[in-house]
Amino acid sequence: ALPCRCEGKTEYGDKWIFHGGCPNDYGYNDRCFMKPGSVCCYPKYE
């Protein structure tokens, strides 16, 4: 996934395109929506 950063955060997350939310299988517990069609998911998946 591409790196992204939500407003107010210092660390980077994973950007997913064309998802209504974050995929379930990566352990994400936070997110913010970026421009239409992309979402930034935290924490970054290793």
Swiss-Prot record:
- Is Cytoplasm found in the keyword set? no
Name of protein? Toxin PhcrTx2
Function per UniProt: Neurotoxin that induces paralysis (but not death) to U.thayeri crabs. Partially and reversibly inhibits glutamate-evoked peak currents (IC(50)=4.7 uM) but not voltage-gated potassium channel currents in cultured isolated neurons from the land snail H.aspersa. Weakly inhibits voltage-gated potassium peak currents (IC(50)=6.4 uM) and steady-state currents (IC(50)=8.2 uM) in rat dorsal root ganglion (DRG) neurons. Weakly inhibits voltage-gated sodium currents in rat DRG neurons (IC(50)=0.9 uM).
Q: Which family does it belong to?
A: Belongs to the sea anemone type 3 (BDS) potassium channel toxin family.
Location in the cell: Secreted; Nematocyst
Q: List the disulfide bonds.
A: C4-C40, C6-C32, C22-C41
- Any one annotated GO CC term: extracellular region
Q: Which GO terms describe its molecular function?
A: ion channel inhibitor activity; potassium channel regulator activity; sodium channel regulator activity; toxin activity
User: Which keywords fit this entry according to its UniProt record?
Assistant: Disulfide bond, Ion channel impairing toxin, Nematocyst, Neurotoxin, Potassium channel impairing toxin, Secreted, Toxin, Voltage-gated potassium channel impairing toxin, Voltage-gated sodium channel impairing toxin
* Additional notes on this entry: Negative results: has no inhibitory effect on voltage-gated ion channels Kv1.1/KCNA1, Kv1.2/KCNA2, Kv1.3/KCNA3, Kv1.4/KCNA4, Kv1.6/KCNA6, Kv2.1/KCNB1, Kv3.1/KCNC1, Kv4.2/KCND2, Kv10.1/KCNH1/EAG1, Shaker IR (with the inactivation domain removed), Nav1.4/SCN4A, Nav1.5/SCN5A, Nav1.6/SCN8A or D.melanogaster Nav1/para.
Gene source species: Phymanthus crucifer
Q: Which InterPro entries match?
A: BDS_K_chnl_tox, Myo_ane_neurotoxin_sf
Carries keyword Nucleotide-binding?
A: no
**Source taxon at top rank:** Eukaryota
Where is it chiefly localized? secreted
What Pfam families does its record include? Defensin_4 (PF07936)
